[in-house]
Amino acid sequence: MGCATTSVKIASIVLNAVLGFLAAGAIGWIAYNADTETEEFVIAAYIACSLILVFALLGIFAAIRESVVLTATSAVFLLILAILQIVSTCLFLHEFDVKSGRDMVEVAWQANNMDSLQQKHECCGQSSAQDYIHLSLLIPPSCYADLQQTPDHLYLDGCIEKVQSFYESDKLRFIIVSWVLVAFELICFALAVFLAISFKNKQRRMEF
């Protein structure tokens, strides 16, 4: 096996490993943010990232074993995954509306269920702590950092602004992660095609 093929083989193993780690990280990120997304999105994202992880591992195994069939299989499925992900990401960009932070906070406010939002997003009230004061209510402990009810630990930002910012950042993170995964999938696909051809040529030379 030539130096070029050896270099590509090593690069393929490394990049597939990186792709696998990215997919595993994406699964962890989805699990952490599952409560902020629709059930359909979470299930689809789990399936997609799990498939990416499986075929990244297959790519590593195929390169190590120098298997033409496994390398070609890995290449085909990585290309299919990349195409599907490009289509889904483009649809997401054009059709997905960022969730309304105002709606989320207003529902929690009406249900008197602000504590989890205030602690998670480090905010207080709908617009500020004044929302409680205007209603002659005590500012709840969840409005304070580490639940320490002192003025210097009070969260100053309102939850509508913080939750909306979280949703917008969440969408941006998803888009970035999605395009990074697509880039790695396409690179690993190209390397797998090169390796499949190289392994096939090696087999032919060994037959003579």
Curated annotation (Swiss-Prot):
Major location category of this protein: membrane
Topology term for the membrane: Multi-pass membrane protein
GO biological process terms, semicolon-separated: synapse assembly
GO cellular component, one term: extracellular region
Keywords of this entry: Membrane, Synapse, Transmembrane, Transmembrane helix
Highest rank taxon of the organism: Eukaryota
Transmembrane feature ranges: 10-30, 41-61, 67-87, 174-194
InterPro entries xref list: Tetraspanin/Peripherin, Tetraspanin_EC2_sf
Tissue: Transiently expressed on motor axons, growth cones and terminal arbors.
Location(s) in or outside the cell: Membrane; Synapse
PANTHER family named among the record's database cross-references: IP01817P-RELATED (PTHR19282:SF521), TETRASPANIN (PTHR19282)
Family: Belongs to the tetraspanin (TM4SF) family.
Job of this protein: Facilitates synapse formation.
Protein name per its UniProtKB record: Protein late bloomer
Organism from which the protein derives: Drosophila melanogaster (Fruit fly)
Gene for this chain: lbm
